[in-house]
Amino acid sequence: MSSSIGIDLGTTYSCVGVWQNDRVEIIANDQGNRTTPSYVAFNETERLIGDAAKNQVAMNPTNTIFDAKRLIGRKFSDPVIQSDMKHWPFKVIAKEGDKPHLQVEFKGEVKTFSPEEVSSMVLLKMKETAEAYLGKTINNAVITVPAYFNDSQRQATKDAGAIAKLNVQRIINEPTAAAIAYGLEKKSQGERNILIFDLGGGTFDVSLLTIEDGVFEVKATAGDTHLGGEDFDNRLVNHFVDEFKRKHKKDLMTNQRALRRLRTACERAKRTLSSSAQASIEIDSLFEGIDFYTSITRARFEELCADLFRGCLDPVDKVLKDSKLDKKTIHEIVLVGGSTRIPKVQQLLQDHFNGKELNKSINPDEAVAYGAAVQAAILSNEGGAKVADILLLDVAPLSMGLETAGGVMTTLIPRNTTIPCKKNQTFSTYSDNQTGVLVQVYEGERAMTRDNNLLGKFELTNIPPAPRGVPQIEVTFDIDANGILNVSAEDKSTGNKHKITITNDKGRLTAEQIEKMVKDAEMFKAQDEAQREVVESKNKLENYAYTVRSTIKDDKIAAKLSKEDRKTVEEKSDEAINWLHANDSATKEEYEKAMKDLEAVCSPIISKVYGQQGGENPGNFSGAKTTEEDLD
């Protein structure tokens, strides 16, 4: 059994797998679901993660956070974030410069969390799901990210793992992980060109790989880190908001709860339209007492999302062009991600490849976690012979380079270069007697740096004065297996060296911030545990009170008790039930004391009955064990 897990940290749902008994086991959560909503909610008494958080979202929309993956590693001023904020019921604010933070009310206080912290809570839930199944503590994990995630987003995801106290052995790309799920059993077919089309809840990747004898080599990757099922939901929401306005002259945008109920109905309708030609929406008392009953056809849905669906083909063309392969040479087109169930997406893709049959052999929701679990087993040397000869050769999704005179982007590592990789180039000074150079590192494909993404900068100083062009400054770019960049610069004449892992310019968390967040996470976990114990002791008391009350109402049992005893039990159990209703937020100790007091009175009386029957004394038949159904 592997001691390392594979986690697919998704925009809308997450999934965890482990290598066990020579195969991957996808692990179900405490609700029995194999995928867990990437939701975290805060209320007056507790923090909820996963299904519990998503289930209460309509009641608590402003304090229920989702889509952290759409925020992670991005700037607050990013137009994408600004546009998303129109759809989010929770509050996003700028902190520490231009970094987005999420603001919620928790236990009556205003709290802010970074996207890394929220993601770490989801990771923690996946870690606990695996630990409950495996019966041991898990410290190591492989976490997946969209292939088109940039350096900042990868680093931030790694930080989220650290906050969840996970040693992130590797960050791997989602389509590459899915390719492992597809190719693990297919080792003897010679070289095959595979196109992975991965359209999920919030991100979209296309990767082209060749697979041969266990070697998975990515040739090219492209995508959109901001396209997925949620965008299709948004189109439906906007459509119905307009319809409601037309019919009832009222604006749903003014009410977050109504909007959330509508969004949930839209998501359900979208899923229905994958198998039916029409879906109905029925929401009672949606807004100001108005019931909203309507329907939508598949054709109308396809029209609403037409530009988004068509846009899915652009990255397909890009990877074909970058890998210099013709459509005809693609052996398999493999579908991954829940949104690939949409018939129109399948039809457009199939038409694009002249009617070629699409490969639907892998589970679109679980394939990524499956591949991550295989990689986790390999990195822990626990996969055995079955995975021994698997080799992953992935690529850098974006070109990396630095700014040279005139704001020109000089690329050191072109996009789709196999990683890990190292490239160096020698530069010189721009003016006479220049004693320092500013090294500014960018990623992107545009000719001028102003159109690309600044990753970070540093200064190399103390260069001996010399005419321009004389000093030799060697800059080295080193991308590790996680796709994260390290840069160093060295003045060859003095040996003066400056090395950085691209850090704070891109809003990365410092080691101190991560340390504080780890402590906070431990505190929240302890609070969660304490809250669970309170609920358990409350339920225990409630169960006991109701059980003894119903016991004495049983005619057979009542006949064996004196009137006084019956009255005592009835009064005491009613008293306990009334106390429970009046003290909804009592402490664990108070519930336990009330339980003790009630037992002290009722147990001896109930024992008399069982004593007369010659049966076993049920004693603490507070015994009604707390079942799942008892938990609100």
Curated annotation (Swiss-Prot):
Keywords, sorted A to Z: ATP-binding, Chaperone, Cytoplasm, Cytoskeleton, Nucleotide-binding, Stress response
NCBIfam families: PRK00290.1 (NF001413)
Membrane spanning residue stretches: none
Function: May function in protein folding and assembly, and disassembly of protein complexes.
Subcellular location field: Cytoplasm, Cytoskeleton, Microtubule organizing center, Centrosome
Protein name: Heat shock cognate 70 kDa protein 2
Predominant location category: cytoplasm
PROSITE patterns named among the record's database cross-references: HSP70_1, HSP70_2, HSP70_3
GO molecular function annotations of the record: ATP binding; ATP hydrolysis activity; ATP-dependent protein folding chaperone; heat shock protein binding; protein folding chaperone
Superkingdom of source: Eukaryota
Family membership noted in the UniProt record: Belongs to the heat shock protein 70 family.
GO cellular component: centrosome; cytoplasm; lipid droplet; phagocytic vesicle
Ranges where the record places region Disordered: 609-632
GO BP annotation list: chaperone cofactor-dependent protein refolding; protein refolding; response to bacterium
Family matches, as Pfam families: HSP70 (PF00012)
Record's keyword annotation contains ATP-binding: yes
Organism field: Dictyostelium discoideum
